[in-house]
Every structure is written in structure tokens, then in C-alpha cells.
């Protein structure tokens, strides 16, 4: 029988051999990428309407059919080396604009200061090459320690030695300006963010040409009237923030006042004396001086030249040697070892007081260049990036606050002085700025009703209430407690008597403490903080008949006590004792009440609660088991580069209450914003943060699983919204599924932003907007679901609203109900008798992260055996774990 098959049988070939141990590849299931939800139809309607003004300025646009052309910029020295120094690029490109206007087709460009420029319409060619020459700075061959002038080129003006620069401009892309026209109609398109970036670069270039310091989207003029000294040789410099924003009403320019920290310009020695609080340089800590001066710029009084500081000399000016190429009578050079002081004597330059102090070094490690400190002046507008002290922070807040009329006047003047409408690139773009504040309509939401002791209703007035002649909602008993005293000036007998009296008036049964106040042994007052704490606990153990359940700790200083961290660690981690630290300056009823509010909350009591928590007022929260979550990540202060980030998540407990919270805190990689420990499967178990909180809710809520999970996330920018949804929310969903595969709770995710620049002003008066003012139209996002809420009464400066973004809402809240819930959660903050500016769960997460940051000492963390967190990835620096709270306090509001 004939067949076309190779084997002649007419059958298909046999299947290939499959090994028995072969595991088939399964294509991973692709997850749907979540995006921020769209705004529901219609805005909220509850509340009394109020006319407002906002610091958004309208934008007109008359060139919808054009294009922004994007060009790459390469700047090289004449010998082909790339120019890498910051700052010089703008001078070079300004020279190109000035010299080659005709070659540029009479076009103006917007340059970002680095490697990009934009034009309106195309340049004559896709690739243009130019050469420019800048003014030459006089040689510095005679400066001590470097006769070849390498140090002159340390900062942005260094290339002036070579004078000539080669500039290459090449086409990269084009951006349709139609994107801006669409934004004016409230529509977002693919190219909108690129187009807005061009407009922002135009404004930055305008500020740079006025000699401003640029910090992201803020700019600061070199005007002493804008400098506000805050101590320590540091000043707050007031400037302006500006950015283009898309809104429901179209495109707007958001302008606000902004402040950055700068070093005190002038003699270096004056700055150091102020920075270290010294009367003369002989008591100076020169190691500290070296750290604070590094990379700052100085002007040399002998030549008016500028340099960047690389360090200090190892020896004093009179002892520091360097090799001087000294000219002789024959016009030749001979190398001579000489001290810096004698070098200046040889040059007949008097050094008055610097001989005993280190020199300023502006050279390279192998080629130092030294100047006596008295010849060095710090140039103006240099950012101070170290951590501020508590005193500096307080001074900054005090001196930079502006009442609404003052802020409005400042913004009006700033916009006028900037004169944006005269900018040639902005004119070419067809963009013009309306100089009037935008009018918007707000609503004042009804004030939520509170419940206090004996079931009594309490209605806050203007965002405030008090407990005068009232008791707390759930007062506790303070028993088996003691007073420990690290302060030598506190009248402890009066404090104890008044605290007991005030507590009983508020319904708290404060029993008498153990008989003796435990005072610190004076001989330990100058010992290290950990030694002082250990000694205090030795006294507690020997003097008290039983272990205490609560300790009231009196500190000498409220914010600067080095005892605070070790004390908290000993109590919360090692022993599980609830503690409250105080540093009383005056004992009055208000102070004692505030202390008792914290004590009551930490011991499991409840000071006040929302009336809706015990009523069916909001069925989606009070009729269905609901957990409310607050999340924040703390990254430490500027200058603390070796400190890990701290992630804190708090959650409500004892449903239907939404006023009590438990915290879970872990460390994670430095500067990582997304929380990576929410779901953490290890050996078949979930050791993540969210599981811990879900189990606490279950056991504290009579074995109920939450059917609704409402998440408030703090501290993320709009560019991170997708990560919140697709990383953090996904982890929480996985944690739920891991606990019970059949359990499918519904989620709502809301981001709370405080770090923005939108402000509101009453159009009919000088006061701040009333508490409860909400804005959800006109200047809100054209597509996404967001609103601004001023829940609190702004008593100082201008009220900063919180900007809430609803990213996800499976629960399906009506707009009014969701806004009412957010507003109400500003009234459950147990430490205060005022509405706060952001929902309480977010505040609690921030407090928990901050408190655990003080509990741990970075260098001790790796030695902690009972701990949480701790990540080690190949090639990464291990993250030290967070000490685990003692079981006695793990569910308490220890952070309150």
C-alpha cells in the first residue's frame, strides 16, 4: 500500500518522548492593572455653600494646532571633554541664544539647565552645532597649595579657564500643543504631562535668569528681605512655588509661597560660631565644622573668586605645609615647603586671626588648595540640607507663618514681579496667565456629633470642644502606678495631687501612686542615657512592692531629652509597661486634661467617640463589620542617610467602634515609599503586617471578619497612585485570601495629601475658611475622584487643606457619605479636643512610626533577637529589624 508518510504506514508520526519527571511550564496568570477610579457623576451636595478664592490662576491659550519641539543638548569643552558642572549650562545656552539668534531661526527656547531644551515650532535644522566663548576669570596661580589652577574649576564656573565651549543641539521629539487645549476643556490626553513639563521649564528658566535659587518647582530670589534667621547660622528663605495644573475648570497656574533653608551668607567663621553656639573659634568642634561646610561655596575676599569647599586642612594655618613653586630671580620656579601662614607673609598679606585654626580646603584630595578661614565668605542662596533642631523648627514655623490676607498680598506681588506674560517663549506658546485668584464654591459640612461620658451628646463649636463639667466616654482606672523624675525642678507633690483631682473630675479613677516618687540619683545625670534609664529601673525594682502597670515619667526637656528613646524602649519592648512622659512648665487644668487624655487612651479607655459609632447613621460602616486602616512611611530627617525607613499601619478594633486603633510597625529599605511587609509568606505562613491587624480586628470584634476595608494612605505622590493600587492593595488582598480563600472583603482606598500648594481664602473676609469646608469641583482633577477638605480650625497662618484622592471604591459609597466619613474621622483623634487637619488613622500611623523610631537605636537593632522586619537581599545593605512590642502593650494605643 502506497503512502506519503515517511514510515509508509499511513499513520501520523508518534508523539515525542516526554521524560517522566518533566514539569510543564504554566504561563502565569496576568493580573489586571488597576488605575485610579473616575469621579462619580455629580459632586457632593451636603452643607452650606460658601464663596471662596484659591491660589490657582487661570490660563488662556490661543495656539492649539502647534507643537513643542524637544531637543537634546550636549555641551563639551574645546578638547571634547563633556561639561558636567551644574549651573554653567544656563550661561552657555544663554550665550548661544544671544549669539546665534539668526541660526536659531529667530526662535527662543526653554532650557532645563541640563540636557534638554524646547522650542515652539522646529529649529531650522534637526542638528545644530555652535561654539561660544565666556568671559575668562583671572588666573589664581598664587593661591596656596595649587599653582596649576585646578581648583578654580571646582564649581560651575570652572570651565571659564578654557573659555570656549562646543554646543550640539539635536532633535529628539515633538509634543502636540493640542494637549493643552484639551486640558482647557477638562480632558486629559497622552501628551499632557509632557506639555505641562515644557510650560514649567519655561517658568524655571525665567526664574533662573533673575538669579534665583531653583529647588524643584520653587524659586528663591537673592533678597535679604526674604531671609528669616532661625538660629544656628541658618535662615529660612521665602520664595514661590509655581506649577501648571489640570482642573475641571481647565488649565491653571498654582502659585504659593515656599520656604527653603539656606546658610547664613558672609564670613565662614561667623557662620560656624552661630552654628555651634560658640563665642570664639577656640572652642570650635572642627570635625563638626568640616561636615557642615563640605560642598558649600565660598568667595575669596582677596580675588572675589568662588570655590566649592572640599574640607579643612589637617593642621592649623601656621602648621599646615604645602609645596610652593616659588619664582626665583632667574624667572624659574623652585619647589619650597612652606606653611600657609608663612606663604601669605611672603606675599605681604596680613593674616589677622586664622593662624591657630584650620584652613579652608577647596582643592582635590591629591591637590589641596588652602585659604585662611578669614579670607572666606559663604556666598548667598546656598541650601542648608542638614537636620534642623527642634528650636530651629519652632522658629521657622513662628517666623514663616502668614495670615490669609498677607499670603494673598504676597502671591499677588510675586505673580506681578515674575511678569510671566512678558516671557518670549510663553508668548510664542500662546499661553497667558490671568492675574486674578480663581473663584470657587465650597460647602461647610455639618459638624459631627460626639458622645462623651454618661452617653451625653457633645456638639463641637468651630471644630473645638472641651470636657469642662463632663466625663470621658470610657474612663479607665489608673492603678499600681508610680512617678519617676529625671527633672530636678518639678514639684512632684503638687503634680500628683492635681493630676488625681483632675482625673476624678473627668471620670478617671486615679488611685494614689506608690508612696515614694523615684528621683534620679544626681550622680547619674551626666551619664549616657541608657545608663540613666537602667539605673532608674534598678531603683523601681528595689523600691516598689510590685511591678508597676503604669509609669509617669517626668523629663527635664520636652523635645530634646536623650532619655526619651531608651525609656520608651525599656517600657514598651522589654517590660511591657504603659508609660507617659511629660515635661511640665506650668500646671493648669488644660495641661493636666491633655495629659490625662493620653493616659486614658493608652490604658484602653476612650475619651470621646462619634455618635454614629453607636447608631445606624452610616450603614456601610456601622451595620457591616468594617476595619479602617491608616498607613504611613517615615524616612527620617535630612542628613540621616543610614537610617532605615519605618512603615507603620494602624487599624481600628472593637467594631463598631472606629475610634480605637492598634499599630503595627516595621523597618524597610531606606527611602522605600511602598510598604513591602503587608503580606510576607514565609514557610507556609504569612508574617506580614496586615495579617496581624486582621487577626486583632477579628478577636477584638467578637470573632467577626471585616467585610469592608477602608484604607487611608499618607505620603504618596500622584505618580505613585498606581503602585498603591497594584503593590500595596494587592498585598492586602493576598493577605485576606491567605487567611481564608473563601473570604472576599470589599476595599476602598483613599490617599491623603498634605504636601501640596493649594490654599483657599474667604472672598468676603480676612479669616481662614471655616472648619468643615470642602471643595470638590472647579479646581479638582478633570477625571479622577478627589476633593479638598479643611476639617480643622486654622488658628495659625493660612489653613492648609488635605487633598483626598479616592483611588478605589468597591464598597460603593455615595459621594456625600464618603465625604462625611472622612470629615468625621478628623474628630476621633484621642489626644486632642479639636478636629485635626487629616483623618485620625493617618495621624496615628505617623505617630507610631515616629515613636518606634525613637524606641530603637540604629546601631543596636541588629542585636535585637525578638524582632520584626529585617530584610536582606543579595547585594543590598541589610535592614535592621524593628524591636517587637511586648505583649502587654502590643494592642494598646502606645503612640497616643
Swiss-Prot record:
Residues 267-380 form the PAZ domain. GO terms for molecular function: siRNA binding. Keywords: Plant defense, Repressor, Ribonucleoprotein, RNA-binding, RNA-mediated gene silencing, Transcription, Transcription regulation, Translation regulation. GO terms for biological process: defense response to virus; megasporocyte differentiation; megasporogenesis; plant ovule development; regulation of translation; regulatory ncRNA-mediated gene silencing. PROSITE patterns: PAZ, PIWI. It comes from the Eukaryota. Coiled coil: none annotated. Expressed in embryonic shoot apex region, pollen and developing ovules. Involved in RNA-mediated post-transcriptional gene silencing (PTGS). Main component of the RNA-induced silencing complex (RISC) that binds to a short guide RNA such as a microRNA (miRNA) or small interfering RNA (siRNA). RISC uses the mature miRNA or siRNA as a guide for slicer-directed cleavage of homologous mRNAs to repress gene expression. Associates preferentially with small RNAs of 24 nucleotide in length with a 5' terminal adenosine. Interacts with 24 nucleotide sRNAs derived from transposable elements (TEs). Belongs to the argonaute family. Ago subfamily. This is Protein argonaute 9. The gene is AGO9.
Amino acid at each position: 500500500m502506497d503512502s506519503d508518510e515517511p514510515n509508509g504506514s499511513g499513520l501520523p508520526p508518534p508523539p515525542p518522548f516526554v521524560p517522566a519527571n518533566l514539569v510543564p511550564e504554566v504561563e502565569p496568570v496576568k493580573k489586571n492593572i488597576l488605575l485610579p477610579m473616575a469621579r462619580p457623576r455629580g459632586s457632593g451636595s451636603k452643607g452650606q455653600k460658601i464663596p471662596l478664592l484659591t491660589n490657582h490662576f487661570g490660563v488662556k491659550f490661543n495656539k492649539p494646532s502647534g507643537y513643542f519641539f524637544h531637543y537634546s543638548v550636549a555641551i563639551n569643552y574645546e578638547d571634547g571633554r563633556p561639561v558636567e558642572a551644574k549651573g554653567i549650562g544656563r550661561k552657555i545656552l544663554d550665550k548661544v541664544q544671544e549669539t546665534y539668534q539668526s541660526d536659531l531661526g529667530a526662535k527662543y527656547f526653554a532650557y532645563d539647565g541640563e540636557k534638554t531644551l524646547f522650542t515652539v515650532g522646529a529649529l531650522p535644522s534637526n542638528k545644530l552645532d555652535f561654539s561660544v566663548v565666556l568671559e575668562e576669570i583671572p588666573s589664581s596661580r598664587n593661591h596656596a597649595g595649587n599653582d596649576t589652577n585646578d581648583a578654580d574649576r571646582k564649581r560651575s564656573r570652572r570651565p571659564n579657564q578654557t573659555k570656549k565651549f562646543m554646543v550640539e543641539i539635536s532633535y529628539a521629539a515633538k509634543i502636540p500643543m493640542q494637549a493643552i487645549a484639551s486640558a482647557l476643556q477638562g480632558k486629559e490626553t497622552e501628551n499632557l504631562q509632557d506639555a505641562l513639563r515644557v510650560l514649567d521649564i519655561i517658568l524655571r528658566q525665567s526664574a533662573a535668569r533673575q538669579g534665583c535659587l531653583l529647588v524643584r518647582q520653587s524659586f528663591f530670589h537673592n533678597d535679604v528681605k526674604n531671609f528669616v534667621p532661625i538660629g544656628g547660622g541658618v535662615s529660612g528663605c521665602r520664595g514661590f512655588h509655581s506649577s501648571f495644573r489640570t482642573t475641571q475648570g481647565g488649565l491653571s497656574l498654582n502659585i504659593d509661597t515656599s520656604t527653603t533653608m539656606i546658610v547664613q551668607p558672609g564670613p565662614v567663621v561667623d557662620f560656624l560660631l552661630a552654628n555651634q553656639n560658640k563665642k570664639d573659634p577656640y572652642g570650635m568642634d572642627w570635625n563638626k565644622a568640616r561636615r557642615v561646610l563640605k560642598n558649600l561655596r565660598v568667595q575669596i575676599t582677596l580675588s572675589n573668586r568662588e570655590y566649592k569647599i572640599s574640607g579643612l586642612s589637617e593642621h592649623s594655618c601656621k602648621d599646615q605645609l604645602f609645596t610652593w613653586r616659588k619664582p626665583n630671580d632667574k624667572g624659574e620656579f623652585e619647589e619650597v615647603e612652606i606653611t600657609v601662614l608663612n606663604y601669605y607673609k611672603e606675599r605681604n598679606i596680613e593674616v589677622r586671626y586664622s593662624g591657630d585654626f584650620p584652613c579652608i580646603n577647596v582643592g582635590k584630595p591629591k591637590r589641596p588648595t588652602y585659604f585662611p578661614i578669614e579670607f572666606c565668605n559663604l556666598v548667598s542662596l546656598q541650601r542648608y540640607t542638614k537636620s534642623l533642631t527642634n528650636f530651629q523648627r519652632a522658629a521657622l514655623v513662628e517666623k514663616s507663618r502668614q495670615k490669609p490676607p498677607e499670603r494673598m498680598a504676597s502671591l499677588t506681588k510675586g505673580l506681578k514681579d515674575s511678569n510671566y506674560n512678558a516671557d518670549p517663549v510663553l508668548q510664542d506658546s500662546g499661553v497667558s496667565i490671568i492675574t486674578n485668584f480663581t473663584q470657587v464654591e465650597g460647602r461647610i459640612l455639618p459638624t459631627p456629633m460626639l458622645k462623651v461620658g454618661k452617653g451625653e451628646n457633645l456638639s463641637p463649636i468651630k471644630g473645638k470642644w472641651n470636657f469642662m463639667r463632663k466625663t470621658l466616654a470610657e474612663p479607665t482606672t489608673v492603678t499600681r502606678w508610680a512617678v519617676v523624675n529625671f527633672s530636678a525642678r518639678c514639684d512632684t507633690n503638687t503634680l500628683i495631687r492635681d493630676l488625681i483631682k483632675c482625673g476624678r473630675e473627668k471620670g478617671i479613677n486615679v488611685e494614689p501612686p506608690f508612696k515614694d516618687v523615684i528621683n534620679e540619683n544626681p550622680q547619674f545625670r551626666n551619664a549616657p542615657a541608657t545608663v540613666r534609664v537602667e539605673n532608674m529601673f534598678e531603683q523601681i525594682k528595689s523600691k516598689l512592692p510590685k511591678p508597676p502597670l503604669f509609669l509617669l515619667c517626668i523629663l527635664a526637656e520636652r523635645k530634646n531629652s536623650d532619655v526619651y528613646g531608651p525609656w520608651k524602649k525599656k517600657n514598651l519592648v522589654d517590660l511591657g509597661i504603659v508609660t507617659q512622659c511629660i515635661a511640665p512648665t506650668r500646671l493648669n487644668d488644660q495641661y493636666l486634661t491633655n495629659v490625662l487624655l493620653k493616659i486614658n487612651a493608652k490604658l484602653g479607655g476612650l475619651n470621646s467617640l462619634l455618635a454614629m459609632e453607636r447608631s445606624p447613621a452610616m450603614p456601610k460602616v456601622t451595620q457591616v463589620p468594617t476595619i479602617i486602616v491608616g498607613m504611613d512611611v517615615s524616612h527620617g530627617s535630612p542628613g540621616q542617610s543610614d537610617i532605615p525607613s519605618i512603615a507603620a499601619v494602624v487599624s481600628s478594633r472593637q467594631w463598631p467602634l472606629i475610634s480605637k486603633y492598634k499599630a503595627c510597625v516595621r523597618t524597610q529599605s531606606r527611602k522605600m515609599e511602598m510598604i513591602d511587609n503587608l503580606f510576607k509568606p514565609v514557610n507556609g505562613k504569612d508574617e506580614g503586617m496586615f495579617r496581624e491587624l486582621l487577626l486583632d480586628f477579628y478577636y477584638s470584634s467578637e470573632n467577626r471578619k471585616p467585610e469592608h476595608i477602608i484604607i487611608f494612605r499618607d505620603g504618596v505622590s500622584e505618580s505613585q497612585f498606581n503602585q498603591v493600587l497594584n503593590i500595596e492593595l494587592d498585598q492586602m488582598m493576598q493577605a485576606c485570601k491567605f487567611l481564608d480563600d473563601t473570604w472576599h472583603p470589599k476595599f476602598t482606598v483613599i490617599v491623603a495629601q498634605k504636601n501640596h500648594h493649594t490654599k483657599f481664602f474667604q472672598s468676603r473676609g480676612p479669616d481662614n475658611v471655616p472648619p468643615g469646608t470642602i471643595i470638590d469641583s472647579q479646581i479638582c482633577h478633570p477625571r479622577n475622584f478627589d476633593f479638598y477638605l479643611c476639617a480643622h480650625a486654622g488658628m495659625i497662618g493660612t489653613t492648609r487643606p488635605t487633598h483626598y484622592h479616592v483611588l478605589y471604591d468597591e464598597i460603593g459609597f455615595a459621594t456625600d457619605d464618603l465625604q462625611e466619613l472622612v470629615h468625621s474621622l478628623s474628630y476621633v483623634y484621642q489626644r486632642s479636643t479639636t478636629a485635626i487637619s487629616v483623618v485620625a488613622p493617618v495621624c496615628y500611623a505617623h505617630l507610631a512610626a515616629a515613636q518606634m523610631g525613637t524606641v530603637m537605636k540604629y546601631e543596636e537593632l541588629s542585636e535585637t533577637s525578638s524582632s520584626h522586619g529585617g530584610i536582606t537581599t543579595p547585594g543590598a545593605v541589610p535592614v535592621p529589624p524593628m524591636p517587637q512590642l511586648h505583649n502587654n502593650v502590643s494592642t494598646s494605643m502606645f503612640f497616643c
